[in-house]
Amino acid sequence: MQELKDRIVKEGKILPGNIVKVDGFLNHRVDCAFMGRIADEFQKFFDLNNVDLILTAEASGIALSAICAYRYGKPMVYAKKAKSDNIEGGLYQSEIFSYTYKKKVTLLVSKEWLHPGDRVLVIDDFLARGEALRGLCEIVQAAGAELVGIGCCLLYTSPSPRDRTRSR
């Protein structure tokens, strides 16, 4: 998507460790109209008749996923990184390493909101090392749901997260 490339060049920054900082429009200050155009672009790649819900990880993926879910007329579930007192009925969970926070975290999804047979589209802001996506895929599998697609706004190409994610 050319508009995304242009925004990265114009507004993005490269931080030490080759971290791409695009928090001025993607994952801190969110340009919702632009996110809507990204959702429209994603829609070209997925059969939305074959999607029951959108799944993402807390926190940076929520804005894009919520806009996609709204545009597609689907519910959105996000995997929490901390258990709260209001989660009932059991949990699906997967431990991942967060490169953002430099520590292990556990992704949690209530069994109340993800069911066997659900057809799940995973949407996230970044695919860097593939840890969040690995965890989300493990949760989908544990639920007996079906992963029907993965959409990521930005993909780091080195080291290759795509190869690690495909191998799972």
Where do the protein language model's features map onto the residues?
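Active-site-facing substrate-recognition patch
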Residues: 1-51
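Conserved acidic residues
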Residues: 52, 118, 148
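Internal alpha/beta core interface subdomains
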Residues: 137-154
